[in-house]
Amino acid sequence: MAQKKGEIKIRKMVEADLETAAHIDKLTRGDDRFTTWPFSFESYWGIYHPSITFVAEADGNVVGFVVGGIIKRKESQSIFNLLHTEEPSSLHQLVGWMDMIGIDPEHRNIGIGRSLTESFYRECKRRNAVMRIIAYNNDEKLAGFLESMGFTNSGVVIYKKD
């Protein structure tokens, strides 16, 4: 049963939360989910060791998570080849990338995703970083969610030819 937003607590993720976050990630995979990372939460965590991590708790249980990190803008450009898509480097030296977010299906649509994303954004601002999120352009749910929070589409589209 869904909880009221007032009963949700956002806090920093600790090691004891990793198993639950991995479980939530598995619960959220399916036909209605677009995955921007080609691997699981466990693999992501093992490779990237994210520097920004939050969980949402309801009644003392973890019901959602968000993870990502802050990198220097120059490194961000080389990773995503976005050299000509951002503001001049003198404006924003640090970029906070929100990489993964997961909400237990039983606790959706009560503001947890919004609260986690806001916490991530505040942490980026605290560290003097701009916040960026990569999403598939046909992920209408995520696009609508992000736009409702004030994010704008950067207009970047990656084309490919196999």
Where are these regions (language model features)?
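Conserved beta-strand-loop-alpha-helix junction that forms the acyl-donor binding cleft
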Residues: 105-108, 133-143, 160
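Glycine-rich phosphate/pyrophosphate-binding loop shared by adenosine-nucleotide-utilizing enzymes
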Residues: 6-8, 60-65, 96
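A short beta-loop-alpha structural element at the N-terminal edge
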Residues: 6-23
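Active-site rim helix/loop that mediates acceptor-substrate recognition in acyltransferases
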Residues: 32-58, 67-70
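Conserved active-site alpha-helix within GNAT-family acetyltransferase domains
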Residues: 114, 126, 137-155
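Conserved acetyl-CoA-binding loop-helix of GNAT-fold acetyltransferases
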Residues: 103, 109-122
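Conserved acyl-donor/pantetheine-binding loop and adjacent beta-alpha core of acyl/acetyltransferases
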Residues: 67-100
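Conserved GNAT acetyl-CoA-binding A-motif
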Residues: 95-96, 124-136
